[in-house]
């Protein structure tokens, strides 16, 4: 879970072997969030958005882990070994939500 402010998180669910179960999504977390998955067994949450969700998802197991260069290097090596390369000429970042421009209501001068 990545903190997206308020009670919203960017999240994706994985099984115990690290295989994705869902697509990446933005979720507003409440007591009913992920109920189908939580009913199936231990539900582990971690990331910058997990701590703020721990009280609402009281049956979830909160694990304190942080991303590391070592973990990223392992993923990069696996992709490299498998020939999984991005075509940088056509690469576009993945933005989960559209950017919305707003004007400030505060007067600077």
Where are these regions (language model features)?
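Acyltransferase
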Residues: 63-109
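Surface "functional belts" at beta-alpha junctions
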Residues: 1-68, 95, 100-101, 105
């Amino acid at each position: 879970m990545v903190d997206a402010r308020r009670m919203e998180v960017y999240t994706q669910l994985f099984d115990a072997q690290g295989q994705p179960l869902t697509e990446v999504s933005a979720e507003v977390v409440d007591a009913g969030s992920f109920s189908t998955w939580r009913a199936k067994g231990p539900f582990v949450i971690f990331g910058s958005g997990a701590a703020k969700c721990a009280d609402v998802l009281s049956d979830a197991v909160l694990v304190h882990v942080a991303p590391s260069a070592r973990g990223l290097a392992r993923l990069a090596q696996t992709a490299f070994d498998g020939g999984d390369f991005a075509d940088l000429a056509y690469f576009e970042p993945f933005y989960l939500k559209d950017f919305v421009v707003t004007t400030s209501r505060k007067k600077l001068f």
